[in-house]
UniProtKB/Swiss-Prot annotation:
GO terms for biological process: antiviral innate immune response; interleukin-27-mediated signaling pathway; negative regulation of viral genome replication; response to virus; type I interferon-mediated signaling pathway. Keywords: Antiviral defense, ATP-binding, Immunity, Innate immunity, Magnesium, Metal-binding, Nucleotide-binding, Nucleotidyltransferase, RNA-binding, Transferase. Belongs to the 2-5A synthase family. Residues 439-477 form the Ubiquitin-like domain. It catalyses: 3 ATP = 5'-triphosphoadenylyl-(2'->5')-adenylyl-(2'->5')-adenosine + 2 diphosphate. This is 2'-5'-oligoadenylate synthase-like protein 2. ATP binds at S69, R213, K216. CDD domains: NT_2-5OAS_ClassI-CCAase, Ubl1_OASL, Ubl2_OASL.
């Protein structure tokens, strides 16, 4: 493919034809890519590690996974990038992989150079630029036997973290705990999750894969060609952003127009400073270590595009996004983007402010049935309060609070957002209606649960006991209330005890 076809000069409603005749891999190219893959794979399985010790041990190839565009089903014609992930028995942990990867890559390189004549292809081992970090792959340039094109293949030795992979199940959260605690360079261990990355893309409809091809072609011809020396966001980052645009703009439908989808992606790239994208398909907020890590990740500077398979891999942190936005803005003025219709992704970004997904909020109030609403984690909490007040027909001052597992109950300020409190997933909130001069106090039960109560600041502790009993709490016989470690008498006055708004009082059983 010496001369790349002109996307910008193609009318939007002709993009299907353009893709089919210019970008779809042709049979001869696919067959040659397949043959090269099979020969290299056979070399690793049957020759590379046979009859020789590596790291003082016999090394076995546990499995070989095809990644990259070819593995995901989004390759371009005569532009093939194949990732061959070698899961090796010599790696028993992420830390061991980090320590021994260079030795393994050097060994593979020497064996390939020694045996490349037997592979029936002209193979060149590309030299990586010297840098602070050890390369995680070995790049091969394989000369096509039927054209002047080059098949690029990255060989990535990896730790088999997933074990027996099941595409329909979430990995055990302990796998991600180990990944996070390893504290490696962000995304450095992503090859261990290549099967998840591949399935995340490969399982999508054919029409979406065609849109992915179109976006990747744009990245190749108009970004990489124009900004050859710049560090640009990866193709994988653009793939994930395209999938997000499709999910939001079509509600994951396979019935859409390519030009509308392409325009939606360009608009997202133009507004990259609003992007915060993540999925909970393979990891979520249930595990404490993972939850705390994700909260910190999602508080970072935009754009944020978390790898759905590897939470340490924020694909938005790397590359000159301003150059991408500049080219996307120019692209939107070209023939390929002249379309009468638009996807609703921009509206979604206004609704899912800053491009983040809505949080499911379960609203609870004593004496009333709980209910659920969706809200944006970056939207002011005062807007959330207004929705609750209207839905529940409340007329007093609305006080809302939440409690992390094992933590103290915290009031939610209307001047802040849920994201300010690190809330990006499902959350239960307690609603309390107060009338001046009432304050809100929290009572902590022995099991760790905190409940809010509205009470006059001049009321006695006995009045608070009455409210606790009305709420279904224990009676005073076998229990005491403590504040800052001191037992409270029934006749004590809250104001005299200097108990202020949002203070916590401990409920404790008499020993």
């Amino acid at each position: 493919m010496d001369t790349l076809p002109d996307l910008y000069g193609t009318v939007g409603d002709s993009l299907d034809y353009f893709l089919e005749h210019s970008l779809q891999p042709q049979r001869d190219w696919k067959e040659e890519g397949k043959d090269a893959w099979e020969r290299i794979e056979r070399f690793f399985r049957e020759k590379c590690f046979c009859d020789e010790l590596l790291l003082d041990q016999e090394v076995r190839v546990l499995k070989v996974v095809k990644g990259g565009s070819s593995g995901k089903g989004t390759a371009l014609n005569h532009r093939s990038d194949q990732d061959m992930i070698l899961f090796l028995s010599c790696f028993s942990s992420f830390k061991q992989q980090a320590r021994d990867r260079k030795a393994v890559i050097d060994f593979i390189k020497s064996k390939l150079i020694h045996c490349r004549k037997s592979l029936a292809y002209n193979i060149t081992v590309r030299q990586h630029k010297e840098g602070k970090r050890t390369p995680r792959s070995l790049t091969l340039e394989i000369q096509s036997r039927k054209s002047n094109d080059i098949i690029c293949m990255d060989i990535l030795p990896a730790y088999n973290a997933l074990g027996s992979f099941s595409r329909d199940c979430k990995p055990e959260p302990e796998i991600y705990e180990n990944l996070i605690r390893c504290k490696g360079y962000p995304g450095d261990f992503s090859p261990s999750f290549a099967e998840l990355q591949r399935h995340f893309v490969k399982s999508r409809p054919v029409k979406l894969k065609n849109l992915l091809r179109l976006v990747k072609f744009w990245h190749l011809k108009y970004l990489r060609h124009k900004y050859r020396r710049a560090v640009l966001p990866s193709k994988y980052a653009l793939e994930l952003l395209t999938i997000y645009a499709w999910e939001m703009g079509t509600d994951s439908s396979d019935n859409f127009n390519l030009d509308e989808g392409f325009v939606a992606v360009m608009e997202l790239l133009r507004d990259y400073q609003d992007i915060c994208i993540y999925w909970t398909k393979y990891y979520d907020f249930q595990n404490e270590v993972v939850r705390n890590f994700l909260k910190e990740q999602l508080k970072g500077d935009r754009p944020i595009i978390l790898d759905p398979a590897d939470p340490t891999n924020n694909l938005g942190r790397r590359g000159k996004w301003e150059l991408v936005a500049k080219e996307a803005t120019y692209c939107l003025l070209q023939l390929c983007c002249v379309t009468a219709d638009r996807w609703n992704v921009q509206v979604s970004i206004a609704h899912y402010l800053r491009g983040a997904r809505d949080v499911q909020v379960t609203v609870k109030q004593t004496g009333r049935e709980e209910w659920i609403l969706l809200t944006n984690p970056h939207s002011p909490i005062r807007k959330l309060k207004a929705k609750i007040k209207k839905r529940m027909n409340l007329c007093g001052e609305l006080r809302i609070s939440f409690q992390e597992p094992g933590g103290e109950r915290q009031p939610l300020s209307g001047r802040k957002t849920l994201s300010d409190y690190g809330i990006f997933s499902k959350v239960n909130i307690r609603v309390m209606e107060t009338f001046p001069p009432e304050i809100q106090v929290f009572v902590r039960y022995p099991g760790g649960q905190n409940k809010p109560f509205a009470i006059d600041p001049d009321a006695t502790i006995l009045s608070l006991w009455e409210k606790i009993e009305e709420d279904g709490g224990p009676c005073t016989e076998d229990w005491v209330l403590l504040f800052e470690g001191e037992e409270l008498d029934d006749d004590d006055n809250l104001a005299e005890l200097q108990i202020k708004d949002c203070d916590t009082i401990q409920l404790s059983r008499v020993s």
